[in-house]
Amino acid sequence: MFMRNTIGYQIKNCRKYKGYSLQAVSEATGISFVRLSKFERGTEKPTAQNINKIENVLMVDFSNTDIIDNEINALMAEFKESIFYLRNNNYYLDLIESNRERYVISSNYYKILLIEYIVNVLANYDDVIKLENEIEATINHSMIDFQLFIEYRAVRKHSMKQYDSAMKLLKEALIIANDEKNMGMIYYHYGIIAHSCEQYFEAYDYLVKAKYIFDKYYSYLRSGKCDLQIGNIYIRLGRYDLALNKLNEWLKALKDTKEERNLKAIIFRNMAWVNILMRDHEAALKLIKEAEKLSPKNGNAILYKIWCLYKLEDYKSAYKVILNNKQLEKDKIYRDRFILFSYLVKDRNEHPRKRTLDQAKKVYEQFLIEKKAGVLDFTILIEILEKSNETKELIYYLKIKAKV
């Protein structure tokens, strides 16, 4: 049992779903407000007579919910499989909404809320706090469902850049987990968070563990996600050859389904990025064009394309790409870099204007705050400083680069 008194939980859910206040139910049943409140909190168990009165008001039957309980258990099992195999799980929200009136009378209703919570977390929806609080108030900390809850709570914390909290939650989830597939998912999420914390070797170890489990159970899309993350670790460590090999291996293994085409586009973009870091801008440009066929108008691909054309001194083509993608000026993720690249293209290979230098500093400093500053950000800034003859600032940023 996940509560001392599941009937109280069922009464509360049905009452709220039907839009009744406690006072309204009290007046309709003749049961005092205080006693109803105790029923819902689970501090007092209602008699059969009281349950019957409440059922009549809410127009429900709590006596026979076994079929619905089992249906919800089956739905949760199916949902967990969809996560493990990286299937589209958005349809669960529509399914839940169309069956909520049936589900809400079940003592397993918290599992429905958990499915909704995870789908919303994965979709990066902001409004999940209410769901999170409701689940936390009803789920038992010894249950395997609690492991799933704190795992995706950690995923949400990671998206908010609360890395320490995310790590702590995942360590707790690892202790509770007793299923190999669950372990694989936790390893995967732990590897991603460790990567964000720049703990690259720990991230690598966890991703390798996760990949082993995904391969064992034929979850090749998840396995590919591990390869992408491992490739990113190689990039961070400056092992561009290993990164390209890892990405290329996975690219060859992918099929032509919609999900795998999206993954191919990501791989092409990542390979383009590696070639940019290796200063092979022609090779990078070819890879970007392949990515564009699969996923046009991607912000990163657009920026990579502008940069490659700029470095190849094809300013006319670069400017055309800028004109065709003015929407990035309004995108908070890409805006500052898009403006910087626009300035660079307008300056061509001549002495950079002050606005270009200021924008390069702005981009670099912002990325530094977010812990995203990388080789290219330094390269752009240092190139501009060299052309501007800003000796003092050049030395300052070169010292920072040496430390990084």
Stretch-by-stretch model annotation:
Residues 1-17:
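A short, Lys/Arg-rich alpha-helix, primarily the initiator
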Residues 19-38:
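Short alpha-helical DNA-recognition segment
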Residues 96-101, 133-139, 171-176, 208-219, ...:
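Amphipathic alpha-helical segments of tetratricopeptide repeats
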Residues 111, 148, 185, 225, ...:
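Residue register of alpha-helical TPR repeats
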